């Protein structure tokens, strides 16, 4: 009787195991291309990240996935098609926190120039 009770207890009570974050994964992708992200569950000790790949001063690539917290503050260099690309990482600790769309190249500059263009067109400058 005791073995049956123990068996029923083990079967009926769910085992709670620590779960990792759910993040989006995109392989290295060109900024002018799109990625169909795949949902992935990170190991418990990892965070979600979005990486910005730069060639010189220009953002040219991005990627998303999971990485160890200790690696979030490190930049990495990778040779891609003969070009030395420097990746910097932005990590976050919530489910799907790396799902925000990437900024379009030059988007911030465009936002800064729009008010000046509007004033110029209105003859205020």
From Swiss-Prot:
Covalently attached lipid (GPI-anchor amidated asparagine), positions? 98
Chief location: membrane
What is the organism of origin for this protein? Danio rerio (Zebrafish)
- Give the protein's recorded name: Protein Bouncer
Keyword Flavoprotein carried by entry:
no
The note filed under miscellaneous reads: Was named bouncer (bncr) in reference to the colloquial name of a security guard at a bar.
Source gene?
bncr
Q: In which tissues is it expressed?
A: Highly expressed in oocytes. Not expressed in testis.
SMART domains, sorted: LU
């Amino acid at each position: 009787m005791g073995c049956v009770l123990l068996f029923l207890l083990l079967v009926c009570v769910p085992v709670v195991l620590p779960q990792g974050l759910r993040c989006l994964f995109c392989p290295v992708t060109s900024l002018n291309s799109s990625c169909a992200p795949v949902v992935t569950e990170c190991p418990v000790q990892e965070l979600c990240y979005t990486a910005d790949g730069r060639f010189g001063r220009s953002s040219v690539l991005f990627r998303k996935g999971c990485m160890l917290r200790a690696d979030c503050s490190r930049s990495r260099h990778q040779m891609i098609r003969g070009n030395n690309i420097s990746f910097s990482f932005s990590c976050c600790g919530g489910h799907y926190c790396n799902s925000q769309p990437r900024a379009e190249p030059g988007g911030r500059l465009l936002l800064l120039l729009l008010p000046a263009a509007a004033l110029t067109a209105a003859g205020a400058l």
